[in-house]
């Protein structure tokens, strides 16, 4: 990105440092940048370790998508006969693939090579020490470069005791005019990346998950039971632990004692429409108001692009936000979690900026941080939501009995959750109580109007009356144990939080049917708890742990967010019932949609830019002309009817799996009432064609300026 290599001594010009109401402002080096991702730029490398020569071929490695965490995998190729160099192919892990050290050593031995595992591991570590790079985009490259030029010119003019002639000053004025023209021109390249970053994104690969009871006694249920892909769905139920090995298909239709067409024992088994694409429209037609019938939306996307694309549709619809962002610790978690403080602040600030438009006026946000970043997070949250809207700092005391002693400091047994209102005056807060270990006796009191004070209630004998109390108001220190490694609730995600913790947050800040958002969904705990508490929910997450299953940081198969939510709907599985299920009497049921969003890297790969002459406009300075006016970008998906003066969009030319109905819903900022093969109908009655969508609505998706 375009920005200063070394932090400047002066303060930035984008905001005043001193104002009438603020004398402390948080500054960080990358504040003017959009954070894209952190990645290593691996290049092919010759290495010599303990006298053994290695060559690592990284030519086929592609950059990661956004900020997902992926392991590097090595495969032995050959021994070069001329000098004995061991050649390895290097790639990012796909579908849980790992480096098999024993197999590599055997293959090297077969190829007449000599090597031990210690030397091999050393060589791998040397290769992986290649530079890690943070990728950014400057939000306003023109303003930044002009500022830097002004500072350079000022320092040049006033350094030392120089006396400037009129001719020299004229030269400097000419230099400034030329520099500004060059800046106007080159900043357009960075600005184009900003436009791609912020452009609305296509919805792709969408499916619905709903429990069998939602289909009732409809004809769709019969079609489902005879569908050729039903065995694949049954295998998924088995993999998620919802049914046993002895389950047979006929058990689904076996009538129970009440004579229902669906056996009650299996009424909450979840159907994923990815197996039944030919029945999807038939299923959706069963709902009079589709989006209103959904319990939630699960979005596979980098969080900023997800929030940016969803901002219009979910504007002022979120009652409560809980996020558990990367803590900036550098530990080996299931996502990248090792940032410089400036990078971490940019990662979080760009997303927080979008949340204010999503929250209702009565809404709240809870940000979960630990010791490595909470001091920065508090100031950042004050900047975005205002110090006057700070409500509390909740201390989650999770006491770990395995915490080591004698480490030169007090054992660390808590984390902070910062609680802010969008608007303190209008905020809705619902106090909670917590049970006491032992009943407590409290004096019964009343307000004595005559004496204008509180008095104790006394019986006829003049004795003070006591009431037995079994619970007390919940304060800001929450004593909730951390999930143990053997807990049924734990899905294999390292930073997973207990449902009991999230339950307190949701109950204190929302009512049933109101919506909860988590845009760092992680293991899906927020979404799971929201479903069990009968709230609507919206979750955003990127990476392989989005799916039914994934390979975690320990190299083990683990349940992903999608799989966990399916178990929640079923009310049973490898991990369910667990958490708050018993106390909430949760047995299952539900309906949600999941999909992925087109990502920044997808657009970079698909957009077409040509090395051509600039478009000549006789009425405009060429330095200010839009450099990319001639470029197709993604217009190869559009067919122009010159006679009819119309543009026809063909989504299949871009991606094979675009969900046009959801894409249009996000573009229009409207909830879907009904979807047919020909059109999508919104809740306000507007209909939009799916066979020939409105060009003006589609245009920003394929051509931006």
Model-derived regions, located:
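Short acidic, glycine/proline-rich loop/turn micro-motifs
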Residues: 332-337, 404, 487-491
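Short, glycine/acidic-enriched loop or turn micro-motifs at the edges of active sites
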Residues: 305, 327, 373, 521, ...
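Mobile active-site "lid"/loop adjacent to the S-adenosyl-L-methionine
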Residues: 319, 325-347, 351, 362, ...
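Conserved SAM-binding loop
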Residues: 299, 366-367, 519, 539
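Conserved SAM-binding loop and adjacent beta-strand
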Residues: 488-501
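Conserved proline-anchored active-site loop of SAM-dependent methyltransferases
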Residues: 313-331, 381, 516-530
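Accessory, often C-terminal, charged low-complexity segments
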Residues: 1-290, 295, 311-319, 352-356, ...
């Amino acid at each position: 990105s375009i920005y200063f290599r070394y932090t400047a001594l002066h303060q930035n010009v984008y905001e005043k440092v001193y104002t009438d109401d603020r004398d402390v402002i948080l500054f960080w080096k990358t504040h003017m940048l959009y954070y894209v991702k952190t990645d290593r730029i691996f290049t092919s490398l010759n290495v010599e370790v303990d006298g053994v020569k290695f060559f690592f071929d990284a030519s086929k490695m592609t950059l990661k998508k956004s900020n997902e965490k992926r392991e590097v995998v090595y495969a032995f190729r050959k021994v070069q006969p001329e000098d004995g160099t061991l050649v390895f192919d290097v790639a990012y892990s796909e579908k849980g693939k790992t480096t098999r050290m024993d197999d590599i050593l055997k293959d090297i031995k077969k190829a007449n090579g000599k090597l031990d595992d210690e030397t091999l591991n050393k060589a791998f570590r040397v290769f992986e020490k290649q530079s890690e790079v943070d990728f950014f985009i400057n939000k306003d490259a023109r303003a930044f470069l002009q500022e830097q030029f002004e500072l350079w010119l000022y320092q040049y003019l006033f350094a030392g005791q120089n006396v400037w002639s009129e001719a020299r000053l004229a030269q400097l004025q000419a230099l400034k005019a030329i520099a500004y023209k060059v800046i106007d021109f080159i900043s357009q390249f960075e600005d184009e990346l900003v436009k791609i970053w912020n452009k609305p994104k296509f919805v792709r690969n969408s499916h619905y998950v709903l429990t069998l009871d939602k289909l009732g006694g409809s004809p769709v249920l019969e079609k489902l039971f005879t569908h050729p892909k039903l065995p694949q769905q049954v295998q998924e139920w088995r993999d998620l632990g919802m049914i046993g090995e002895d389950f047979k298909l006929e058990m689904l239709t076996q009538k129970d004692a009440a004579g229902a067409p669906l056996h009650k024992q299996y009424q909450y088994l979840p159907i994923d429409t990815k197996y039944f694409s030919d029945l999807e429209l038939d299923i959706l037609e069963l709902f009079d108001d589709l989006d209103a019938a959904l319990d939630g939306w699960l979005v596979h996307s980098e969080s900023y692009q997800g929030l940016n694309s969803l901002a219009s549709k979910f504007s002022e619809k979120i009652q409560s936000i809980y996020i558990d962002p990367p803590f900036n610790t550098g530990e080996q978690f299931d996502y990248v979690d090792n940032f410089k403080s400036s990078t971490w602040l940019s990662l979080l600030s760009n997303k927080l900026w979008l949340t204010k438009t999503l929250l209702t006026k009565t809404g709240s946000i809870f940000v979960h941080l630990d010791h490595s970043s909470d001091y920065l997070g508090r100031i950042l949250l004050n900047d975005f939501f205002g110090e006057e809207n700070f409500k509390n700092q909740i201390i989650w005391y999770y006491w770990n009995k395995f915490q080591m002693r004698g480490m030169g400091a007090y054992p660390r047994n808590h984390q902070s959750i910062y609680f802010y209102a969008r608007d303190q005056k209008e905020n809705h807060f619902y106090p909670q109580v917590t049970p006491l270990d032992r009943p407590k006796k409290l004096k019964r009191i009343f307000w004595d109007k005559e004496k204008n004070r509180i008095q104790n209630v006394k019986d006829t004998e003049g004795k003070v009356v006591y009431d037995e109390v079994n619970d007390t108001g919940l304060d800001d220190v929450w004593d909730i144990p951390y999930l143990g490694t053997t807990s049924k609730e734990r899905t294999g995600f390292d930073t997973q939080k207990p449902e009991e913790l999230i339950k307190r947050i949701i109950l204190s800040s929302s009512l049933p049917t109101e919506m909860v958002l988590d845009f760092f969904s992680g293991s899906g705990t927020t979404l799971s708890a929201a479903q069990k508490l009968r709230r609507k929910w919206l979750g955003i997450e990127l990476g392989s742990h989005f799916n039914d299953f994934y390979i975690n940081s320990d190299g083990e198969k683990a349940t992903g967010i999608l799989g966990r939510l399916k178990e929640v709907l079923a009310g049973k599985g490898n991990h369910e019932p667990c958490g708050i299920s018993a106390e909430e009497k949760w047995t299952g049921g539900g309906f949600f949609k999941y999909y992925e969003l087109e990502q920044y890297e997808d657009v970079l790969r698909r957009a077409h830019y040509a090395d051509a002459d600039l478009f000549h406009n006789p009425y405009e300075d060429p330095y200010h002309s839009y450099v990319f006016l001639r470029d197709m970008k993604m217009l190869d998906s559009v067919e122009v009817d010159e006679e009819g003066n119309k543009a026809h969009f063909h989504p299949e030319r871009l991606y094979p799996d675009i969900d046009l109905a959801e894409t249009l819903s996000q573009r229009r900022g409207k909830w879907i009432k009904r979807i047919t093969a020909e059109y999508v109908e919104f809740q306000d009655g507007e209909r939009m064609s799916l066979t020939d969508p409105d060009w003006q609505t589609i245009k920003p998706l394929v051509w931006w300026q």
